[in-house]
Every structure is written in structure tokens, then in C-alpha cells.
Amino acid sequence: GTDDSEGNAIFVVNAETGDLVWKAVQGGGGGSATVFEHPRLTDSIPSTLAAGDTDGDGFTDRLVVGDTGGNVWRADIHGPDTSRWKLTLLASLGRHGTGASGIATDRRFFHRPDLVPSKDGDGMFDAVVIGSGNRPDPLDMGGMTTNFAFMIKDRHVAPGSGVNENLQLGDLGDVTSNCLQSDSPCTVDLTDGWRLMLTEPGEKVLATPLTITGKVFFT
């Protein structure tokens, strides 16, 4: 994949008037009260965004989405002061990741993630569940890109608390061959989440994941 000059932005608009409220775009960090710039926002965003309410007041204040470069983004839009709204990089799981090179790491996110408020022994977190796959080529059986199903633990759950974590593939525990096939307890480090490799040639995720009572379903 290559960087995109279109589609690499997030817009918040007034539903009644269509007026711009706030947007996040690629740039050097200048911006204004209604424009936030992030230098890493270089890939298009083809899906809708997952929305969350971090403080339970009935208003959306957290957005999460993936892009076609394998990045996962978090937008904090808490409160009426848009100059405090921000976009942060939660994870880099594709061609922009540390040590990534070639088509094998050209992972793309075409579908909205599932955002699930959760808790473990380390405290509260938002589970960001997402899967990679090149949707424009669903019948590709070449298997040249290694796709995954992911669950990322975003522990910055307080309103406006997002930071550029930039989690990498290796930060997520690999559950492909040592957790799902065994009845014994999983010993993989799941502090930041997990990754499940899709091992069949051309295998990819082609829909938004669905989480029900602790179980995740991928298509």
C-alpha cells in the first residue's frame, strides 16, 4: 500500500445544519480550535467509527476507527471546548509498524471495530476488536498478506485521556496456536490485548466483529 491524499480525515459535523464542528487531518500539529493535525494520519478511513461514552453521561466522547494502513485511531471529543479534542494513535499493526516491510505486513482495516467496555485484573479498559483484510479483493487466495483478528486493550478510559500509545504487533499476545486449542490456562501475556493469525491462504476479516457475553464473532 501507499499513503493516501484523500479519505485520510475524520469529520464531526452538526447533524441539523451540516456545519463543521471539528475535524482531524494529516499535518504537522498546527491546527486550530476546529482542526486537529496528526502527522501519522496518512491512510484513508473507509469505515464508520465506533462510538463510546467514557463517563456515562449519555453523550459520545470517544471514537475509534482503523485505516487502510493498519493503524487504529482513538479520538477524544469530550466536552464543548473543541480546542481540547484530539486524535491519538492507539496501535500500528500494518505496514507502518516497527520492522514492517513488504506485502506480508500490508494489513488494512475496512470495517468498523467493536468497542466493548471491559475489566481485567489490571483494571478497566476498552476492548477494541478489529480484523484486517483487503475488502476490495475478497476472493484473493494468494495469501501474500498475513491477516489477523485483534483485540486491543485501551486502558486510557477516562474522558479525554487518550495518548499516542502506538502499540505494535508484538505487544499483543499471540493466541494463534497456544490458547484456543488447549483446555489448560492460557499463559500468554494479554496485558495489551491479543492477536489471532488467520492461517489459511487469502483468509481475511470481511465484516465488523460482534461481541456477545464475552465471546467475539468474526466473519
Regions inferred by a protein language model and the residue ranges of each:
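Beta-propeller fold recognition
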Residues: 1-219
